[in-house]
C-alpha cells in the first residue's frame, strides 16, 4: 500500500524541492519533514493542507493511498552522469505513473493479458526470426511498414508510457519491466520520434528475449531493426546488391517506414545490400549536409483515454492529480 508519506515525498520531488526548501515553507526542519515522509509521526491536517498548497495538489491527493505496484527497477536505464538522488526522483515518477495506470485500469474494469511470454534467443538470425514471428502475430505483412508502433503495442495489452522532459528526468533513457505480469515500457518524450520509436522496439525486445550471450544489447538492436525494417522490405525497395544508392532513396524509405536515415543505412549494410564504404559515404553526406528526417511523433494514448472517459462518467472528478 502507498502511504501518506509516500505521496508527500512524490509530490515534493515533482516540485524539485529539497527537504530543507519544502520544510521551511511550513515551519518544518528537514529532519521534521523527513519524519512526515517516513510516517514516523502523526500527520496534522493543517500541515498537510499547507504542504498540498506548496506542492500544487489537493488534500485528497495526499490522502489517496491505493495499492501500489511492486516494481524492481532492475531495468531502469539512465545516463552515466545521473546522480543517485536524481535516480530516486525518476523512480518515484515511474512508480506514480504505473500506480495511476493500474488504478485507471481497475476503475475502467479493464483486464490486460500478457500475450507474449519470453523467447530464448542467442543469435542474430534468431533475433530477426523473432521479429518476423511478431509481425505475423500482429498480422502485418513482412514487406509493409508499422505505421504506429506505440498504438499497435497498446492494442495488444502492452503498457507504454512517456515521461515529460524536465530537470528531474534529464538523463532518463528508458524503463521496461513485467509488472503484475504485464509488459510495461516507459520512454522519455523525445523531440525526435525516430529515436523514441526505435527505443520502444528495442525495449520490447529486452522484455521478450532471454539470452545466454553477454551482448544481449546487440540482439535487441537486431530485433528492433528487423521489426521496423524487415530485410525483405529492404530487398524489395533497394535490390539485393547495390554499388550506389542516392540519398533521396533513403529519404523516401524513411518517410514510409519511419526509421532514421542512419538506422536504414545500418540495416542496408548488415543485409549486405551495400558495402561498409558505401555506408560510410552516405553517413558522411548526411552529416555534412545536415540532413534531417521528416518530423513525426507517436503518442501513448490509452492512459488519457481511460482518464477522460472516467472523468466524463463522474468516476474521477479531478483529472489533474493523474497528470
Language-model features: locations:
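Active-site hotspot residues in diverse enzymes, especially metal/ion-binding acidic/histidine motifs
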Residues: 1-323
Amino acid at each position: 500500500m502507498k502511504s501518506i508519506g509516500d505521496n508527500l515525498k512524490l509530490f515534493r520531488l515533482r516540485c524539485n524541492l529539497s527537504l530543507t526548501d519544502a520544510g521551511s515553507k511550513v515551519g518544518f526542519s528537514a529532519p521534521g519533514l523527513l519524519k512526515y515522509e517516513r510516517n514516523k509521526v502523526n500527520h496534522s491536517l493543517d500541515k498537510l493542507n499547507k504542504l498540498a498548497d506548496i506542492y500544487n495538489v489537493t488534500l485528497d491527493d495526499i490522502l489517496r493511498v491505493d495499492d501500489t505496484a511492486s516494481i524492481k527497477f532492475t531495468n531502469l536505464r539512465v545516463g552515466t552522469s545521473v546522480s543517485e538522488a536524481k535516480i530516486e526522483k525518476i523512480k518515484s515518477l515511474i512508480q506514480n505513473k504505473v500506480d495511476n495506470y493500474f488504478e485507471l485500469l481497475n476503475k475502467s474494469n479493464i483486464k490486460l493479458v500478457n500475450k507474449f511470454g519470453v523467447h530464448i534467443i542467442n543469435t542474430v538470425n534468431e533475433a530477426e526470426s523473432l521479429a518476423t514471428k511478431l509481425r505475423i502475430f500482429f498480422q502485418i505483412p513482412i514487406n509493409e511498414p508499422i505505421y504506429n508502433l506505440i498504438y499497435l503495442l497498446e492494442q495488444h495489452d502492452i503498457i507504454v508510457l512517456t515521461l515529460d522532459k524536465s530537470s528531474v528526468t534529464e538523463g532518463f533513457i528508458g524503463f521496461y519491466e513485467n509488472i503484475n505480469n504485464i509488459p510495461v515500457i516507459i520512454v522519455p518524450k523525445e523531440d525526435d520520434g525516430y529515436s523514441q520509436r526505435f527505443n520502444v522496439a528495442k525495449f520490447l525486445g529486452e522484455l521478450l528475449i532471454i539470452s545466454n550471450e553477454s551482448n544481449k544489447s546487440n540482439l535487441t538492436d537486431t530485433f528492433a531493426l528487423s521489426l521496423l525494417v524487415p530485410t525483405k522490405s529492404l530487398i524489395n525497395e533497394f535490390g539485393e546488391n547495390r554499388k550506389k544508392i542516392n540519398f533521396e532513396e533513403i529519404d523516401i524509405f524513411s518517410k514510409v517506414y519511419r526509421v532514421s536515415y542512419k538506422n536504414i543505412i545500418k540495416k542496408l549494410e548488415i543485409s549486405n545490400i551495400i558495402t561498409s564504404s558505401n555506408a560510410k559515404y552516405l553517413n558522411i553526406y548526411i552529416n555534412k549536409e545536415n540532413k534531417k528526417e521528416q518530423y513525426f511523433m507517436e503518442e501513448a494514448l490509452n492512459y488519457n483515454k481511460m482518464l477522460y472517459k472516467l472523468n466524463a462518467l463522474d468516476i474521477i472528478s479531478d483529472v489533474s492529480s493523474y497528470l
